[in-house]
């Protein structure tokens, strides 16, 4: 490769790249908002439809499977119709889901709207990191790729905050009627309309991915965008991209197969990163955190407030990753995070393993409660500066131009399936073996992740996408 053809820090249009990456990351914001907004409405939904916990739980878990479906489908759509049209499709799904989730007649049509929104979430989880990686200069790609996770955790935080505010103003999520005669829980879902419409409108205003345009034989359009994004020796950059895309056929899932017929090793690594990101149990902390905080002695109201605070900590730690990912690299941050999660989850396993059970709930007293409170937030910190944002950075950049969208869709689909497995197995684990052994399983996954990163993941800091 000709070093002079690589974009330099002086020629890159940082403000423009940050702007268009921020628009793409709005999909991540909606991803976080949509998955978290239901938490504040669960009790009201159960009361409104008179459903049992199993059926209510399906409204959460089936949305995760919808996300897996959306992720698997987004890659082919993005390769056939482009990154921008895929964003617009996701925005439409978010908009329809937001409206429909607030106007259900039965629990079953509510589940339909949640699954539809889940498909949008899955599509956004693929297209945002792919687009950001494809428009970012190499020296900025880690920081810009981390915007995806920052947007996700910000979406979660804003959803929790808006749920809390609406419930506070209405006197409870089940308060009916409230604003304009609609129950408070309906407004929790309708709030998503604002970012969904903003995402859809802004997607019309940003340029298509230059890598996609080159693959479609539109080199002149790609060159104009690359000049605005990177500057430097654009003709050489176009030649490099042309050498790494499939010009003889449209991208397809069969490109992920090796000559022996199995998946390419890099695809397995992407799937491993996605699965381990979920198997360390981060969503247990956010989905079921009230169990943890009540066991320490907090009331339900204070438990919800602490969950909001934990979400804010997650935002701050993601900013740490943005600051250091292009300085120290991806691999060191992942290793530090894995070690931190292994230690903190191990401590939580020991602490809750010795907890007394009162009315079916683990209860901690004295120093044990304080240790659990501090350790849980240290665990969130360890995840927040490493596996939260860095996995999205790697998934966006580790695959070559020929297979990026397809491979990312497979990896993201695996991530949503792993999320579904963890979210649905935690309640029975809690009922059968308790919190201690459950955290022990997640600690084991964190320990495995250390060896996985050490032996299988290569550093990508500073490399162009054409060097992958």
From Swiss-Prot:
Q: Which residues lie on this side of the membrane: Cytoplasmic?
A: 1-17, 79-84, 136-149, 208-265, 329-331, 388-412, 458-468
Extracellular face of the membrane:
39-58, 106-114, 171-186, 287-307, 353-366, 434-436
Instruction: Show which residues constitute the signal peptide.
Output: none
Q: Name one GO molecular function term.
A: carbohydrate:proton symporter activity
One Pfam annotation, family name? Sugar_tr
- The domain of life for this entry's organism is Bacteria
Q: Where in the cell is it found?
A: Cell membrane
UniProt keyword list: Cell membrane, Membrane, Sugar transport, Transmembrane, Transmembrane helix, Transport
Specify the protein's topology with respect to the membrane: Multi-pass membrane protein
Q: What is one GO cellular-component annotation here?
A: membrane
Which family, according to the similarity comment?
A: Belongs to the major facilitator superfamily. Sugar transporter (TC 2.A.1.1) family.
**UniProt name for this protein:** Glucose transport protein
Look up and give the organism this protein is from: Synechocystis sp. (strain ATCC 27184 / PCC 6803 / Kazusa)
């Amino acid at each position: 490769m000709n070093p002079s053809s690589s974009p330099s820090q002086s020629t890159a249009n940082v403000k423009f790249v940050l702007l268009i990456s921020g628009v793409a990351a709005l999909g991540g914001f909606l991803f976080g908002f949509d998955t978290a907004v239901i938490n504040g409405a669960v009790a009201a939904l159960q009361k409104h439809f008179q459903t049992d916990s199993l059926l209510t739980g399906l409204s959460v878990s089936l949305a995760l499977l919808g996300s897996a479906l959306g992720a698997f489908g987004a890659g082919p759509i993005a390769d056939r119709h482009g990154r921008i049209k895929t964003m617009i499709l996701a925005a439409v799904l978010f908009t329809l889901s937001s409206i429909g989730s607030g106007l259900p007649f039965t629990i079953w049509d509510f589940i339909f709207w949640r699954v539809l929104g889940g498909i949008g979430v899955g599509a956004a989880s693929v297209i945002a990191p792919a687009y950001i990686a494809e428009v970012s200069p190499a020296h900025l790609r880690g920081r810009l790729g981390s915007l995806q996770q920052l947007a996700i955790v910000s979406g979660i935080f804003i959803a929790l905050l808006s749920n809390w505010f609406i419930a506070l103003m209405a006197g409870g999520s089940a308060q009916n009627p409230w604003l304009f005669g609609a129950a408070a829980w309906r407004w929790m879902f309708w709030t998503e309309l604002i970012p969904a419409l903003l995402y859809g409108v802004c997607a019309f205003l940003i340029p298509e991915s230059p890598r996609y345009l080159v693959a479609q034989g539109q080199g002149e359009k790609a060159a104009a965008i690359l000049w605005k994004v990177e500057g430097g020796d654009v003709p050489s950059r176009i030649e490099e991209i042309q050498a790494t895309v499939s010009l003889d056929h449209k991208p397809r899932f069969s490109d992920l197969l090796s000559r022996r017929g199995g998946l390419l090793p890099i695809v397995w690594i992407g799937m491993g990163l996605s699965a381990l990101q979920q198997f360390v149990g981060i969503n247990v902390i956010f989905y079921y955190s009230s169990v943890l905080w009540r066991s320490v002695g907090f009331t339900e109201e204070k438990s919800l407030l602490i969950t909001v605070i934990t979400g804010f900590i997650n935002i701050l730690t993601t900013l740490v990753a943005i600051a250091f990912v292009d300085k120290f690299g991806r691999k060191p941050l992942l290793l530090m995070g894995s070690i931190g999660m292994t230690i903190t989850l191990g401590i939580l396993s020991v602490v809750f393993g010795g907890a007394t059970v009162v009315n079916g709930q683990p209860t901690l007293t004295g120093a044990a409660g304080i240790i659990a409170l501090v350790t849980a937030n240290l665990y969130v910190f360890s995840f927040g500066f490493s596996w939260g944002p860095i996995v999205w950075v790697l998934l966006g950049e580790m695959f070559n131009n020929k297979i990026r969208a397809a491979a990312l869709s497979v990896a993201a689909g695996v991530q949503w399936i792993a999320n579904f497995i963890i979210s649905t197995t935690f309640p029975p684990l809690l009922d059968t073996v308790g919190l201690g052994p459950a955290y022990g399983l997640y600690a084991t996954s964190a320990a495995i992740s250390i060896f996985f990163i050490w032996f299988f993941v290569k550093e990508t800091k500073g490399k162009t996408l054409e060097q992958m």
